[in-house]
A protein has these predicted regions:
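Active-site acidic short loop of glycosyltransferases
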Residues: 31, 75, 132, 161, ...
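Active-site gating loops and adjacent loop-to-helix segments of metal-dependent hydrolytic enzymes
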Residues: 29-56, 101-104, 162, 218-222, ...
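Distinct, well-ordered alpha-helical segments
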Residues: 89-98, 117-126, 145-159, 174-182, ...
Length: 270
């Protein structure tokens, strides 16, 4: 079994990722369940410039699209709601979350594309919201200040009852700082999105095998992201499907590829 904890839909930021692409990819590559977030909730572009208001969507609009997708594919698709920290938490948003807690499995942050630090007051109000609904908090991490792994570590220590997932383990880094931080906080998880299998093994050695989750960013490189990257080279994820399972125990492999996610996000696979 495989649970992919990092899948997208959405048009913008140079990407066009459709519901059809997601269904195609999980069917073709034997993904049993995918956690999906809607990238259209990004408020800033790749240069961290504000996207014109007329081109943005509210987080409620983004969540509505994700909910529709998950409802049409219940049992295979769950939601990580991509929050816009600069927006208020409205009664409508609360109602949408409360009415869909069976498919909303986490709140998702992207400090880079929100141009907002994960430790900001704006972000904290959504961490409180996650705590209120007992939802894990998932966040992109990179090498800047706002999205640095240290910011997640700081929040994990401040909110010990909430579980946090450090996506990418510091994208663009050697992952060592992120892994060391995860070793210091039992409520801090990592994922494999663009993380080498060598770093995954280092994570297991330092943190154990209970807090690493399989994730991919699919279909960011097209509907065959699991097979090859945007240049046509063999995908990193082929290593996770093949070579990686040969260098860890069967129990560890199951934990990383689906069991840890099933427990953290309360996902029941039949």
């Amino acid at each position: 079994m495989i649970i992919d904890t990092h899948v997208h839909i959405g048009t913008g930021l140079g990407f066009h990722m459709t519901e059809e692409d997601v269904i195609y990819s999980i069917n073709k590559y034997n993904i049993d369940y995918a956690l999906v977030s809607n990238t259209e909730a990004a408020s800033h572009d790749h240069q961290r410039k504000l996207i014109p208001c007329e081109l943005q969507k509210t987080q409620l609009q983004c969540l509505e699209r994700a909910v529709g997708f998950a409802r049409e594919n219940k049992g295979r698709i769950g939601i990580m709601h991509w929050v816009k920290p600069m927006e208020d938490i409205t009664p409508e948003l609360r109602n949408m979350i409360e009415n869909n807690l069976d498919i909303i499995k986490a709140l998702k942050f992207h400090p880079y594309h929100a141009s907002c630090s994960f430790t900001s007051e704006e972000s904290k109000k959504y961490i409180h919201l996650a705590e209120e609904y007992n939802l894990p908090v998932v966040s992109h991490t990179g090498t800047g200040y706002d999205d640095n792994p240290m910011r997640l570590f700081e929040m994990a220590k401040r909110y010990p009852r909430t579980n946090f997932v450090m996506v990418h383990l510091g994208l663009g880094s050697d992952n060592k700082e992120a892994i060391d931080l995860c070793a210091k906080a039992q409520n801090l998880y990592g994922d494999t999105t663009w993380v080498s299998t060598a770093s995954a093994l280092e994570f297991i050695n330092k943190c154990g095998d209970d807090r690493l989750l399989f994730g991919s960013d699919s279909p960011i490189d097209g509907k065959d992201t699991y097979l090859n990257n945007g240049r046509g080279d063999r995908s990193l994820y082929q290593e996770y499907f093949n070579e990686f399972r040969e260098v860890v125990s069967a129990e560890t492999y199951e934990k990383i590829m689906w069991r840890n996610a099933s427990e953290l996000f309360n996902i029941s696979l039949k």
